[in-house]
């Protein structure tokens, strides 16, 4: 009995202070007349982080052309395009996986906790650049793990960013 209590106490001490899980639904980038014919698909990804590292695992399907690359971007705020900070491993197909393991500096860890990191997946036919930022195929902001709506639950549009309270940096 006392060994069990000691083991639990040690586990509590060595558990990272910022251990957390994050998730995103990957949906199409904003569509316009140019992109409507070449952008499509869906995906999801999860991130586990201890505040010093993060592990990304995800999948996608239904792209209209093969995936070419995927990145983690840092943005000034959720919903605003940013700059790539990490390259993800991605299956070069219309369906597959994204993954990666990364060391985080303090600014990147704070950005993750504040909902300022997102995943973007690019494909062969998706245009490369909008005037306001990089074009891609699918994207999704990483937020703390949360309930998601089912397929038959109405949403505002093709996808949306959930309104969650995120910790300040």
Model-derived features: positions:
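Bacterial N-terminal signal peptides that target proteins for export
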Residues: 1-6
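N-terminal signal peptide c-region/cleavage motif recognized by signal peptidases
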Residues: 14-16
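N-terminal leader/targeting pre-sequences
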Residues: 18-169
């Amino acid at each position: 009995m006392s060994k069990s209590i000691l083991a639990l106490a040690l586990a509590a001490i060595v558990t990272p202070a910022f251990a957390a899980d994050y998730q995103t639904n990957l949906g199409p980038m904003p569509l316009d007349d140019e992109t409507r014919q070449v952008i499509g698909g869906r995906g999801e990804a999860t991130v586990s982080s201890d505040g010093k590292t993060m592990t990304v695992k995800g999948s996608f399907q239904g792209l209209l052309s093969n995936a070419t690359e995927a990145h983690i971007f840092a943005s000034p705020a959720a919903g605003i395009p940013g700059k790539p900070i990490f390259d993800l491993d991605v299956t070069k197909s219309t369906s597959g996986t994204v993954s990666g393991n990364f060391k985080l500096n303090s600014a990147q860890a704070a950005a993750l906790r504040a909902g300022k990191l997102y995943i973007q997946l690019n494909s062969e036919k998706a245009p490369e650049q909008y005037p306001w930022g990089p074009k891609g195929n699918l994207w999704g902001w990483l937020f703390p793990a949360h309930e998601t709506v089912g397929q038959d639950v109405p949403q505002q549009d093709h996808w949306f960013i959930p309104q969650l309270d995120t910790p300040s940096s």
